[in-house]
Design a protein with these regions (language model features):
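Intrinsically disordered, low-complexity and often Lys/Arg-enriched segments
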Residues: 1-7, 124
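Helix-rich C-terminal "collar"/helical-bundle subdomain used as an assembly and partner-interaction module
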Residues: 6, 22-23, 100-102
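Interdomain "pre-motor" coupling segment immediately N-terminal to P-loop NTPase/helicase cores
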Residues: 10, 14-66
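Conserved, well-folded catalytic cores of nucleic-acid-processing
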Residues: 12-15, 24-27, 46, 50, ...
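N-terminal pre-Walker A segment at the start of P-loop NTPase domains
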Residues: 69-90
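Conserved P-loop
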Residues: 84-160
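SF2 helicase catalytic motif II
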Residues: 165
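Walker B catalytic acidic pair
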Residues: 168-169
Length: 172
């Protein structure tokens, strides 16, 4: 169990505490250390869970989704969309090979819903960094950046993302 606590402390970047824990347990566990071990394990688990939730919350805000959508809310029965393909895409494995996904269809067919739902799945289940843009908003931001003589900042920001969603491409 000591290895688990030490590993957990290091994974939380608490290296000083990991070293102190190792020193405390080096000479064999005393009754005092053993009695506090369960508390430390629970605190580490709580901290790990809290950090994960805060990270997801931060990534969701950073993504700037127009609305929160998920795949459970999409009516596959009323659509011609291939449900199996969408579920396969929901793990965002296509981002590892830098492949693109293009959703094509008329107004009201669920393109934005699906793009948002796939992105939300990436953030919440696969720790992906996502940025959602209306294409018009992105073009306006790039123009503003150019006028301010600060070109390249948006491009650098987008390069750090695992997935960039460009919505409403047809309205350009």
């Amino acid at each position: 169990m000591d290895v688990d606590i030490k590993t957990s402390l290091k994974s939380l970047r608490l290296h000083g505490m990991a070293t102190a824990w190792e020193e405390l347990t080096e000479g064999g566990q005393t009754t005092r250390v053993q009695s506090s071990q369960w508390l430390i394990e629970h605190l580490l688990q709580a901290e790990d869970t809290n950090r994960e939730l805060r990270s997801i919350s931060h990534q969701m805000k950073t993504a700037r989704f127009p609305l929160h959508r998920d795949l459970a809310g999409f009516d596959f029965a009323a659509s011609q969309v291939d449900k199996a393909l969408i579920l396969k895409l929901s793990d965002l494995s296509f981002t590892q090979d830098a492949h693109n996904v293009v959703l094509i269809g008329g107004p009201g067919t669920g393109k934005t819903h699906l793009a948002t739902a796939l992105s939300v799945s990436g953030v919440t289940r696969h720790s992906k960094k996502v940025r959602f843009y209306s294409t018009v908003d992105l073009v306006n931001a790039l123009e503003h950046e150019k006028l301010m003589n600060k070109p390249g900042r948006i491009a650098q920001s987008l390069a750090r993302q695992d997935l960039v969603v460009l919505d409403e491409l047809g309205y350009l």
